[in-house]
Each structure stands twice: as C-alpha cells, then as structure tokens.
Amino acid sequence: MKKIEIELNERSYPIHLGTMECLEHAGAVLVVTNPKVGGLYLSYVLERIRAREVFVCTTPDGEAYKTLESVEMILESAFNHRLDRKSLMIALGGGVIGDMVGFASGIFQRGIGFVQIPTTLLSQVDASVGGKTGVNNAFGKNLIGLFHQPKAVYIDPLFLKSLPPREFGAGVAEMVKMAVTFDREFFEELERGDLRDHSFLLKGIERCVKIKARVVAMDEREQGIRAALNYGHTFGHVIEHESGYGHYLHGEAVGMGMVMANTLACGLGLLKESEAERIEKLLARYEIPTRYAIGDVERFYDLFFLDKKSENQKIKFILPEGIGGVAFRDDLSKSMVLSVLEAFCD
C-alpha cells in the first residue's frame, strides 16, 4: 500500500492507496454509507475495522439527498449510539456520502474525527481529499458547509470494479480537469493512454492525488490557487441546479461546464480552439456529455452570483490558460458572458 501525506502541520494526514489494511480506533466508530455501497462493500470494510464499538448508519443514495435532513439523520444516529468527542465517523461511499459525513463530523459536539473511504472514481481522485464538506439547498450546491480535514483517506481500487460506466466517466472528467489546470504532461498521457486499462488508471489516480495534495498544502482554505480546481464548476453547479440534482452526475456537469469555460477562454485568447477541441475530444472518448442546452440565459447568468467564489457581486471564472495553466477572471462584462451562454441555447 502506497502512502501520500497531506502536509497541513497539526492537521496533516495520510492517503493510503491500495488494498485496504486494518483501521484501528480506540473509541466508538460510526460507519455511514448508502444501501447500494453498503450492500457491496460494508462487510469488506467492517472486517478491517478494529474499534471498541462499530455502528452503521445508512442514508438514501444520490445527490438529491445531500441535504441538511440527511445530515440530521447522521447526527441522530451518532447521538442514539452515544458517540462522544473521542469517537470516529467513517464515510463509505462517493462524494455525496463524503461531503455529508465530513460536515456531520465537523459539527457533532463541535467536531470529531472522520475517515474517508471513497468508492467512486470521482471521490478517489478529488472529493475525498482536502477537507471540503457540505450540503446543497434550494439556492445552490454546497452552499452550507465547512472545511474539516479527515484523519485519513483509504483509496482501494477494489471499489471501482462495480462502478457503472457513467460513474466512471464522471470521475474521468475530474481527472481531465486536474490535467488541464495543473499538468500538461499528464493531459498528454491521458490522450495517449486508456483509463479503462487498470494499471494506467491506478497511475492516473495516484497522479491526481499528488496534484490535489500539493494544491491543498499550498492553499487549504481556497483563498488562492486551490480555486483553480473549480475549473468547470462555476458553469457545472448551475447546470446541476437547473437540471435538478441527480439528473446529471456531478462529474458530467463539470465536463459540460469545462466546455463552456473553454468557449469563454477561447473568446478571451487564453485558449486555442485546437486545445479546446482536444479537451472536448478527451471527455467524449469516455462518453461524458459535453453539451448542455441552456433554456434561459438570463436566469443561468444570475445563478452565477450564488457561486461561493463570487465576491462583491463579481463572478469569478476559472479559465484554462492553455493546457496546463489557469487564469482567474472577475472582470468580464455581462454581455461577453451572455454571448457565450447563447452559444449553448437549445
């Protein structure tokens, strides 16, 4: 099992890559999962936990359930099982479970430890690393949450064997995102290789985790360079909101958002048309949707202002500057942005 360290001083923690080894904890443990993942892997994980007591909480599956109500369900389970400040929560699932358990553990008795065991490609390469937690509400995605770093992350490739093609593609979109913003050489490797090849996939996961680890160590609270990892998300979050949470997987929405961001970047001279075509071609190879039909451009534009990166009523766009670079722009006129959105009207 390989280990990558997230360097955050007293909050540093390891990311373990490989077959999951024994997880030991002196106090009580609450494992939170959903029916689908639990049915496949709960027994596998429970066999590897050594703790005073181990309890299980099962929440509904899907982005539509990433809500305060679901977090309350987790908290009620923690109280019913008499967890205390020495207890540990474990998130066994994809990004939805990880976000909710991270949030619940961060507010339970003012904060207890938690461990991420991500079971989707998206959560293994991105969502499980870095301490972002939160839930959605009527106004938008992840607008209620906090930064709460896990104690450890266990990335076991076994979990990917049962991953449906759409979930796989959603994870690939996040891998492409990291390559475009931080690593041109990695992007070119993704163009040449095939992530459906297991050994190539494992190398890609490790590459993404190292990128994320480096960025988080530099900017834990997303005050600067970490915001680059939101490439595709400014547009993608609006797509998720407008289409209804769960209609598109998060990674699918990010993929479509990347294409929109690329169009804007091309208009500004930051990205060549040929580079935008290469990015879209790579996404399409894994059957990731790349085009979203916007119904109302004014409404779509207004929803940008709910984005967490927006400040002083200015929309901050994360745009590729070539392949391997990134630019932050908050000075774009409404007319310029609308002209891009109109290119995606149905």
UniProtKB/Swiss-Prot annotation:
Cofactor(s) listed in the protein's UniProt record: NAD(+); Co(2+); Zn(2+)
Record's keyword terms, sorted: Amino-acid biosynthesis, Aromatic amino acid biosynthesis, Cobalt, Cytoplasm, Lyase, Metal-binding, NAD, Nucleotide-binding, Zinc
Pfam families: DHQ_synthase, DHQS_C
GO cellular component: cytoplasm
UniProt-listed Gene3D superfamilies: 3.40.50.1970, Dehydroquinate synthase-like - alpha domain
Binding site residues for NAD(+): 61-66, 95-99, 119-120, 132, 141
Enzyme Commission number, as recorded: 4.2.3.4
ATP-binding as UniProt keyword: no
Signal peptide: none
HAMAP family in the cross-refs: DHQ_synthase
Protein name: 3-dehydroquinate synthase
Organism annotation: Wolinella succinogenes (strain ATCC 29543 / DSM 1740 / CCUG 13145 / JCM 31913 / LMG 7466 / NCTC 11488 / FDC 602W)
Gene name for this UniProt entry: aroB
